[in-house]
Amino acid sequence: MECEPALDKALALTGGVIQTTDEYELLERTGLNSSCSSVMKVAAKSCKYEKFNEKGLFLSEHRRCYNEIIEYCNMLVYKGNLQPLRGDGKEDKKLAIRQWPQMGFKQIDADYSGRKGSSRLNRVEAEKIAEWLKNSFEFIVNAYPKEEIKNLVGIITPFKAQVKCIEAELRRNIPSLWNKISVGTVHTFQGAERKIIILSTVYGSKDGCFFIDANKSLMNVAVSRAKDYFFVFGDLNCLKDTKSSASGLLKKCVNGNQI
């Protein structure tokens, strides 16, 4: 059970934890309030180590993703403090698929997404993803002859209804391979990695993209799952134009790189 911020503030005042509502901000910064507490934040504040004027240990070296991919995460959440060490994909002589950009997109026009209960889905988007993989999967497998097939492609989407929709289309289009392609929400891929990650945005151009912009950490995880290529499948017009937002920065990074 989660305590709402308004109740959390009231309890802190009546319990004498804070004397004024202005002091509540201090609890939020230190991670001590019950509505949005963070054990990690409290631990970091107690740590004797400090880097980039932040308390706690910060692992600044990054080797998983090509630099073009991790640059998005670096700008989004790390304030430019990450040190990309893998190098640029376009400069790598061992790059598997040279004609593809490290960050790219496939435009799929849609005004609105569909609703299923409290979730969302976009059937056309799911169909296009399955169709693209049907046409490209053998090519991808041949480009990575020493890699296990299950480690090649992952598909991330913000909505569980879209997960089911994509899985159904994969079963229909590539029945012999669909179960070797991971499909799930960001949480499914926590700690995982794939050579290629596809993001199914789901939103239509008139929907906005609330879920994508709601939590920068989720987009950080989604993008950084991709070792070699990160592709956005959806209507790019649903993404914002402001670079300070997660979707706006993503739009900037993939713009002009249509696959």
What are these regions (language model features)?
Residues 1-259:
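Conserved helicase motor core of SF1/SF2 NTP-dependent helicases
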